[in-house]
Amino acid sequence: MSSKFDIGSLSIVMTLLICFLLLSLAPKLEAELATVQHAPNPDGSISFLVIGDWGRHGLYNQSQVALQMGRIGEEMDINFVVSTGDNIYDNGMKSIDDPAFQLSFSNIYTSPSLQKPWYLVLGNHDYRGDVEAQLSPILRSMDSRWICMRSFIVDAEIAELFFVDTTPFVDAYFLSPQDQTYDWSGVSPRKSYLQTILTELEMGLRESSAKWKIVVGHHAIKSASIHGNTKELESLLLPILEANKVDLYMNGHDHCLQHISTSQSPIQFLTSGGGSKAWRGYYNWTTPEDMKFFYDGQGFMSVKITRSELSVVFYDVSGNSLHKWDTSKMLDSDFYFPL
């Protein structure tokens, strides 16, 4: 009787062990966005610059914008730089050996203050070339600043930045690409790819304990410039951002600088797409009370974050401050509950 019980118990234990091993080896039903840890300053603060639509071999005032970025970056002692995409014009990189990487990036952003990590998303022009070239770790071995992924998180403790690959959301690139060719090799099947992005983003935002949440994408959710609002992002992405109390959405794509804040959404919509060629003279916005700032020239943006305050400044090609916006949040220590 005793030996039968021992054999039976052993059988149950072995069965449970096999089940545990199979479960541990099985793929997770919910994947997670890759996360890069970026330590804040000793006081918990961070500061960074935001530039978009820039890679033109230094032309169209790219070099002048880079010079002023270096000056402002030194004054602020920035921690890193954010790129909102369209890193290499006109058609991305042809290969890992494309000289455009050096001519549009390494040889342009040479100021000492800009020798910090650059966190980059892809834009639609980047998708016109070899996407894997921009994503390759070989580029980082050539220039250690370059950190480019499709979608990922930068965790700076006080703030988390969620980088989203927005180009595959836009129907027109698939339905009517005209004479353009896009590299969708890492995107198909599209429906599954987009759902994965949305699921992982929603999970990351929901689980984030950061004081400030910022989302970065190439395409604008709201814009008064040539491309206007991106309807696919308004319907698919915006509800997730609003439900998870995102503070800022930062983008490029439209070659301008703008700040939109609507009564329908608590999110600040910030466009920094003036890294080189700008689009002068185009403006289409019907609710002037929502447009806090619009500039149809070249420039960039800075962000400074502390435990209780966030400050955004837009600069032109000469480094002049054009627009500033500040907000604040209560510190945890400010909440007092009497016994």
Swiss-Prot record:
Zn(2+) binds at residues 86, 124, 218, 253. GO terms for molecular function: acid phosphatase activity; metal ion binding. The keyword Metal-binding applies. Binds 1 Fe cation per subunit. It is found in: Secreted. The active site is at 227 (proton donor). Its main location: secreted. Expressed in roots, stems, leaves, flowers and siliques. It catalyses: a phosphate monoester + H2O = an alcohol + phosphate. It is an enzyme of class 3 (hydrolase). Fe cation binds at residues 53, 86, 89, 255. Its EC number is 3.1.3.2. Residues 1-31 form the signal peptide. Homodimer. Belongs to the metallophosphoesterase superfamily. Purple acid phosphatase family. This is Purple acid phosphatase 4. It comes from Arabidopsis thaliana (Mouse-ear cress). The gene is PAP4.
